[in-house]
From Swiss-Prot:
Coiled coil start-end: none
HAMAP family found in the cross-reference section: Ribosomal_uL30_B
Transmembrane segments: none
Molecular function GO labels: structural constituent of ribosome
Name of protein: Large ribosomal subunit protein uL30
Native source organism of the sequence: Desulfotalea psychrophila (strain LSv54 / DSM 12343)
Record keywords, A-Z: Ribonucleoprotein, Ribosomal protein
PANTHER family referenced in this protein's UniProt entry, alphabetically: LARGE RIBOSOMAL SUBUNIT PROTEIN UL30M, MITOCHONDRIAL RIBOSOMAL PROTEIN L30
Family: Belongs to the universal ribosomal protein uL30 family.
Gene encoding the protein: rpmD
One GO BP annotation of this record: translation
């Protein structure tokens, strides 16, 4: 695995449950097309798995 993981919000969280919206906020994804780079940890991977239908993941 790489040291960091980059992901982008490509679909809006509007209409999603409160848990999904809280996960997006926890990942730092507040606006559409916002790109965030984080350390690649199991916790971040789990959060991304929960919102995988809303984000694009670039492992670099």
């Amino acid at each position: 695995m790489t040291e960091t993981i980059t992901f982008t919000l490509v679909k809006s969280g509007i209409g999603s449950t409160d848990k999904i919206r809280a996960t997006l906020t926890g990942l730092g994804l507040t606006k559409l097309n916002k790109t965030v780079t984080r350390k690649d940890t199991p916790e971040i991977r789990g959060m991304l798995n929960k919102v995988k239908h809303l984000v694009r993941i670039d492992e670099a």
